[in-house]
Regions:
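Active-site helix of classical SDR
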Residues: 129, 164, 172
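Alpha-helical segment proximal to the catalytic Tyr-Lys
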Residues: 134, 176-181, 237
Length: 257
């Protein structure tokens, strides 16, 4: 097999990474970035067809990747994910990126919808961390949780999503302290990133979101993937328990408004 084109180096040679929510968007870009830098990557998602396509594309580019259909909110599914990772080696990097969102105001949101969002967005990260923890401790690995600017700023229609993303930042701090000598745990906080989710947004709302950034454009999944790769790499060996905001200055503009 041809070696992947190393545009960004080989920081993850000999390492194994698990990326959830990897069938599209930030997760797919992160899986590709880690594989490009030498990691063997296990992609996890419920979207089997799209996930297989992403894994195949990584392989065609010379990387090592396999896809596992799994629900991050189901504890038993994590045994299969870790077993798949072990076909490459112990887990060195865990990127907990899977999410679901229901844009509905609190007074109209059903309890099952609320619970499902917390199960995927928050509990899924806890279950993944716990399943991979023996490897992560042994390998002195790194974990990156994908939060959101919704954790910091109230945006109508996102009560469960915001609650779960805010809780992820607290979980990040807790895990970093509890397992600090052995495992680094950080979070990324993306802002307006141009993924398929924006296909459902009106042109007017898209323009307003761009205008609310300091750089006056959407971010790309690849830009978030670059931040995740940095936090996962040895260059970030003295960084843990914190979050890296990747929002093009959206938070600053909001604070100044």
């Amino acid at each position: 097999m041809d070696q992947p084109l190393r545009r960004h180096g080989a920081r993850f040679d000999g390492r194994t990474a698990v990326v959830t929510g990897a069938a599209s968007g930030i997760g797919a870009a992160t899986a590709a970035r880690l594989a490009e830098e030498g990691a063997a990557v296990v992609l996890v998602d419920l979207a089997e067809e799209r996930g297989e396509v992403v894994a195949e594309r990584i392989g065609e580019d010379g990387g090592r990747a396999r896809f596992v259909t799994a629900d991050v909110a189901v504890e038993e599914d994590w045994a299969r994910v870790v077993a798949a990772a072990h076909s490459y080696g112990p887990v060195d990097v865990l990127v907990s990126n899977a999410f679901t969102v229901d844009v509905t105001p609190a007074h109209e949101m059903s309890l099952p919808s609320w619970q499902r969002q917390l199960d995927v967005n928050l509990t899924g990260s806890f279950l993944g961390f716990r399943a991979a923890l023996p490897d992560l401790r042994d390998r002195r690995g790194a974990v990156v949780l994908t939060s959101s600017v919704h954790a910091h700023k109230g945006i109508p229609g996102h009560p469960a999503y915001a609650a779960s993303k805010g809780a992820l930042l607290s979980l990040c701090a807790q895990l970093a302290v509890e397992y600090g000598p052995e495992v680094r745990v950080n979070a990324v906080v993306p802002g307006p990133i141009l993924t398929a989710a924006w296909d459902r947004v009106t042109p007017e709302d898209r323009e307003r979101s761009v205008a609310e950034t300091a750089v006056r454009r959407f971010g790309s999944p690849e830009e978030v993937a670059a931040a995740i790769a940095f936090l996962s790499a040895d260059e970030a060996s003295y960084i843990t328990g914190t979050s890296l905001v990747v929002d093009g200055g959206w938070s600053v503009v909001k604070a100044s408004a």
